[in-house]
Amino acid sequence: MTLRHIRQILKNTDFIHTGGSAEELKVAEFLKSEAEAMGAKAWLEPFPVQMADIKEAKLIVDGREIPCKGYKNCGSGTVEAPLVYIPAQDYITLKAVRGKIVLIDGGLRHFGYHDMLEAGAVGFITYDGNLNFPNRDIDAKELRSFVADGKKTLAVNINAKDAQKIVLSRAKTAKIAVEEDEYEGESRNVVAEIPGTSDEWIVLSAHYDTVPLSRGAYDNMSGCIGLLETMDKLKSGAPHHYGLRFVFCGSEERGLLGSKAYTAAHDEELKNVVLNVNVDMIGVPMGRFVACVSAEETMVGFIKYFAGARGWSVNAYTGVYSSDSTPFADHGVPALSFARGTPGGQGNIHCRYDTMDLLSDEQLREDGDFIADFTCFMADAVVCPVKREIPDKIKDDLDKYLNRKR
């Protein structure tokens, strides 16, 4: 793609588009049209998602109202109780939460959430933002279904500056009130394909949705551009031995919902998928290129050699990446995620500062070209050299990441 085309894609998607929203659908249709313009067959695959509209959310701490946003899908009601801040969720601090509203660092995660409920917590306050940022933004969070696991509790999110004030003031009581309307909505994956000469496929994935505060240029329209660059480069050599399927995943930021929906709906077809190549955040001018491999260890060495022969530096390692490669690996498909991480101070995600200004069009194209070269090598292989098996260590990491074990 030309640099002008890359910049135009960033401009055309320069707005917040959260999972399940009308704005997400607008971006999905745009990506579909981009794929079709490159000569690929493309379509949308919808899937259901839990949605909620917050009608009212209030947090009163020691008689003073604190700006907040209610957690979507946490239920409706009011709770008033003593307030406690806990810096960890271990057996020591959990003794202090019974009958109390709990202020915590970080988000509500499955085991920590249920540990606090079992210890008697009656409500939750989380926070985000940064003490050093000039804004007082508050992210719109949700109580994810796989976190709640059927047990809803009122929760609100506040800004980091107010969280610090609450702790410094040694606040004693809190009152949370949330009123919401919950309903089932629809997100969708955008799927495009370039058939090969065999009945086996390589699936490339990248999510296109954003969090509520972010326009998502870096996280992750950059990854979508990486897929489009790969599509653009490989279409001229088609058909390759392996077919190429491009999946632009919806609702990744809500818990990998798009890739989970895709792998569940195509479970039988995944037997013919030899590799998943996921792209999540590339194109920043500073920072190292990484490859997280959820497959056999020898693939790490192969990627290093492949990159080194092209003068390309890469930090390759095995593990489970917090992105759309994970559901593929969990379904037995060898998977890897490519990314270019920013050094500290060079960019932030999941906030208002994730804009196209973070990105270099030239670096986006260079990163995309490397991913395309790697994919082309694999697509033209007589036999995909990666064993179609997931090592036990990766399986264990998947169980932990997906909340099946601690």
Q: What does each model-found stretch correspond to?
A:
Residues 101-103, 123-126, 155-157, 191, ...:
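Structural recognition of the beta-strand scaffold that forms the well-ordered cores
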Residues 1-23, 38, 132-137, 142-144, ...:
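N-terminal capping segment at the start of a domain
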Residues 14-22, 70, 103-106, 151-153, ...:
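Second-shell loop/turn segments in exported
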Residues 107-108, 130-131, 182, 208-210, ...:
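Acidic, glycine-rich active-site loops and adjacent beta-strand->loop/helix elements
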Residues 62-91, 139-217, 229-237, 241-243:
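Soluble metallo-hydrolase cores and metallopeptidase-like ectodomains found primarily
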Residues 199, 239, 249-348:
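Metal-dependent peptidase/peptidase-like ectodomains
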Residues 3-98:
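Noncatalytic luminal/extracellular "stalk/propeptide" segments of secretory-pathway proteins
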Residues 232, 345-406:
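His/Asp/Glu-rich mid-to-C-terminal helical/loop segments that flank catalytic regions of hydrolases
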